[in-house]
Amino acid sequence: MKKLLILAVIAATTFACGTPKTVQESRKVIKGYWSLDNISYDSSGTFNVTLFNDTSVECMEGSSWRFIPNNNTGNYTINNSNCPTGERNFIFTIQEIDPASGLYDFLLKPTNAKGKSETNAGYRLRLAQLGESSMRWEQTVSLDGKPFKINMNFSKIQE
């Protein structure tokens, strides 16, 4: 009887700690190669924005992204010849916020080629939309003490 109770507790814990099905489905959809086509703001004006403590919006637009969900890694390449080009590596996590609305947080942490972070700093974005051919991230930052939203629109290149 005691062994049966222990087995039941282990089974319940295993199922309770598993990744939600919707997050698993998101990982399948995000897998592959994407292009960051457009970056916009929820306010009008001219802004000097540096994304992921790396480079400007102008340099980031047109970049190529690869997501490898089975080990939560990826990379992006800056393609604009007027910018510091090259491949950047990252690790990522998709966290479900609300199953009813389908909202997710997307956590991205820049790393070196070996998957190690020099600063251990990461970025939390809202995965506002994810479909078979398009994806949108939203990042809310503070500008003059008020919320300022950055929208990043991706299109899928290939799986």
What are these regions (language model features)?
Residues 1-4:
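Positively charged n-region of N-terminal signal peptides that target proteins for export
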Residues 6-9:
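Sec-dependent N-terminal signal peptides
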Residues 13-16:
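C-terminal motif of bacterial Sec signal peptides marking the signal peptidase cleavage site
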Residues 18-35:
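N-terminal helix-cap/turn-to-beta initiation motif at the start of protein domains
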Residues 19, 90-96, 134-159:
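Edge beta-strand at a domain terminus
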Residues 40-42, 62-130:
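Contiguous, well-ordered beta-strand patches that form the walls/edges
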Residues 41-55:
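Flexible, solvent-exposed loop segments that connect beta-strands
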Residues 54-57, 115:
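Extracellular beta-rich ligand/substrate-recognition surface
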